[in-house]
Swiss-Prot record:
Participates in the reverse transport of cholesterol from tissues to the liver for excretion by promoting cholesterol efflux from tissues and by acting as a cofactor for the lecithin cholesterol acyltransferase (LCAT). As part of the SPAP complex, activates spermatozoa motility. It is found in: Secreted. This is Apolipoprotein A-I. GO terms for cellular component: chylomicron; extracellular vesicle; high-density lipoprotein particle; low-density lipoprotein particle; very-low-density lipoprotein particle. The modification Methionine sulfoxide is found at M109. Major protein of plasma HDL, also found in chylomicrons. It comes from Bos taurus (Bovine). The keyword Lipid metabolism applies. Homodimer. Interacts with APOA1BP and CLU. Component of a sperm activating protein complex (SPAP), consisting of APOA1, an immunoglobulin heavy chain, an immunoglobulin light chain and albumin. Interacts with NDRG1. Interacts with SCGB3A2. Interacts with NAXE and YJEFN3. Residues 67-265 are annotated as: 10 X approximate tandem repeats. InterPro entries: ApoA_E, Apolipoprotein_A1/A4/E. Keywords: Cholesterol metabolism, Glycoprotein, HDL, Lipid metabolism, Lipid transport, Lipoprotein, Oxidation, Palmitate, Phosphoprotein, Repeat, Secreted, Signal, Steroid metabolism, Sterol metabolism, Transport. Sequence repeats lie at residues 67-88, 89-110, 111-121, 122-143, 144-165, 166-187, 188-209, 210-230, 231-241, 242-265. Glycosylated. Palmitoylated.
Length: 265
């Protein structure tokens, strides 16, 4: 049930910090979230890709071609891991600088979110209470029907479904009514939050810390990131050349062997 309320809260207050805001957890840094996601994604691709390569090499065609793809895949995975390790400090520095530049704005927005949260919490609590009551009423109405079904035969299945349908529809209608009431209650606070954000951004423009300045600083950081990443990417290119050349030689050898067999026939 708590998940229902939290979901509605997230829909009401969108943003990357919404989950931590409502659960009162210490928010994970933006860079940590990006880094964790990228690590999981890359590892999943690497593992699944290796499985496919292993399956192909174990097949009759793979054995006949003898391309040694698995060896090349492991070499490639090792090279990519080294690149990721080398780029880690560079991207960390970029993200740290960007977070410092926007720290003031984020602090002000966090204060606004906390204030709005205190105002809307009673409405969320009331919604949760009413939802509990509706579910309990539905359970009490359905319980006798379940007992009746257990005591009856299969022919009563349709009869049971006919009795359950209006009860389920009633629960859905009442739930929609409660959600609509909650939406109307929260609407003014949602508008208030949007107005606060607009005011914060307007204050940035008038105070000299304009959005254009933030954009310029972010562009500078991205440019610096690109310059620092160039040598690492060049190392990656050099590391891939032997792998690609080995793969090319294996494929050409397989084609040549196949041609000889065809000519011999």
């Amino acid at each position: 049930m708590k998940a229902v309320v939290l979901t509605l809260a997230v829909l009401f207050l969108t943003g990357s910090q919404a989950r931590h805001f409502w659960q009162q957890d210490d928010p994970q840094s933006s860079w940590d979230r990006v880094k964790d996601f990228a690590t999981v994604y890359v590892e999943a691709i690497k593992d699944s890709g290796r499985d496919y390569v292993a399956q192909f090499e174990a097949s009759a065609l793979g054995k006949q071609l003898n391309l040694k793809l698995l060896d090349n895949w492991d070499t490639l995975a090792s090279t990519l891991s080294k690149v990721r390790e080398q780029l880690g400090p560079v991207t960390q520095e970029f993200w740290d600088n960007l977070e410092k530049e926007t720290a003031s704005l984020r602090q002000e927005m966090h204060k606004d979110l906390e204030e709005v949260k205190q105002k809307v919490q009673p409405y969320l609590d009331e919604f949760q209470k009413k939802w509990h009551e509706e579910v309990e009423i539905y359970r009490q109405k359905v319980a006798p029907l379940g007992e009746e079904f257990r005591e009856g035969a299969r022919q009563k299945v349709q009869e049971l479904q006919d009795k359950l349908s209006p009860l389920a529809q009633e629960l859905r209608d009442r739930a929609r009514a409660h959600v609509e009431t909650l939406r109307q209650q929260l609407a003014p606070y949602s508008d208030d939050l949007r107005q606060r954000l607009t005011a914060r951004l307007e204050a940035l423009k008038e105070g000299g810390g304009s959005l254009a300045e933030y954009h310029a600083k972010a562009s500078e950081q991205l440019k610096a990131l690109g310059e620092k990443a160039k040598p690492v990417l060049e190392d990656l290119r050099q590391g891939l050349l032997p792998v690609l050349e080995s793969l090319k030689v294996s494929i050409l050898a397989a084609i040549d062997e196949a041609s000889k067999k065809l000519n011999a026939q």
